[in-house]
Amino acid sequence: MNSLNNLRTNNPLVICYTNDVVKNFTANGLLSLGASPAMSQAPEEAIDMLTPANALLINIGTLTKDREQDILEIAKTANEVGTPIVFDPVAVGASQYRKDFCKTFLNTVDVVVIKGNASEILALINNDAKMKGTDSDDNLNAIEIAKEAHKRLNSAIIITGKEDVVIQDNQIYQLNNGSALLAKVTGAGCLLGAVIASFLPTDETTSISQLVEATSIYNIAAEKAEQLAEDKGPGTFMTLLLDALYQVTYDDYSNQSDIQEVQ
């Protein structure tokens, strides 16, 4: 399935309720890829924004009490008009406050995809799980966490890390592309959530092939950016990642993706 070319032909509108740290980078990343971002946070305009939209991204990176009801109202409106939701529970394991909100959110709203690192996804299904800020525990078994989260949360799950894990309809793939520099740029994971949202179809059930393609395209772009950055570091890499998202092609995905099905 060539979802990337379809994306660039149709310029899908992605409504982003995302955190304050990453709005600019997320918007520029989506524009570079070929999507159309709108950074909307007002429930008063939700129905107008979401009716023509292809997807909604909800990212709780800078969650506050004042924003809780707005997030819930916007997400419920997306459900009402049939706009698919990607949920990014940033640092959910770092505080009980975030765990409680995510539990309320997932009990109230239907989401198509939940994306996070292994520690974040574990915290959604295990209230005792802990995190240090947004950092993930590399010793966790991402595949087993993804399986359990998929079963309990009834959503596609994408776990990011050195290798990424994607599960949908009980099919599981491990994706081995990517760059270590992604972990050195604030907002790189948040941008991936928006990229995944831009690949979601509005008129059919999201397939695992679309989720695998979206995640792999992003990671292949990151590999290209790292090569071009040479040894210059994260600042150069961040700018080159936007260029790489603009330049990456479906042929790159076909020829360079490193994907393993997990039995």
UniProtKB/Swiss-Prot annotation:
Organism: Staphylococcus saprophyticus subsp. saprophyticus (strain ATCC 15305 / DSM 20229 / NCIMB 8711 / NCTC 7292 / S-41)
Binding-site positions, substrate: 39, 187
Cofactor: Mg(2+)
Protein name: Hydroxyethylthiazole kinase
Binding site for ATP: 115, 160
Positions of transmembrane segments: none
Gene3D superfamilies named among the record's database cross-references: 3.40.1190.20
Pathway(s): Cofactor biosynthesis; thiamine diphosphate biosynthesis; 4-methyl-5-(2-phosphoethyl)-thiazole from 5-(2-hydroxyethyl)-4-methylthiazole: step 1/1
Function: Catalyzes the phosphorylation of the hydroxyl group of 4-methyl-5-beta-hydroxyethylthiazole (THZ).
A molecular-function term among this protein's GO annotations: hydroxyethylthiazole kinase activity
HAMAP family named among the record's database cross-references: Thz_kinase
GO annotation (BP), single: thiamine diphosphate biosynthetic process
Keyword match Nucleotide-binding: yes
Catalytic activity: 5-(2-hydroxyethyl)-4-methylthiazole + ATP = 4-methyl-5-(2-phosphooxyethyl)-thiazole + ADP + H(+)
Top-level taxon: Bacteria
Keywords of the record: ATP-binding, Kinase, Magnesium, Metal-binding, Nucleotide-binding, Thiamine biosynthesis, Transferase
Pfam families xrefs: HK
Underlying gene: thiM
Family indicated by similarity: Belongs to the Thz kinase family.
Listed SUPFAM superfamilies: Ribokinase-like
InterPro entries: Hyethyz_kinase (IPR000417), Ribokinase-like (IPR029056)
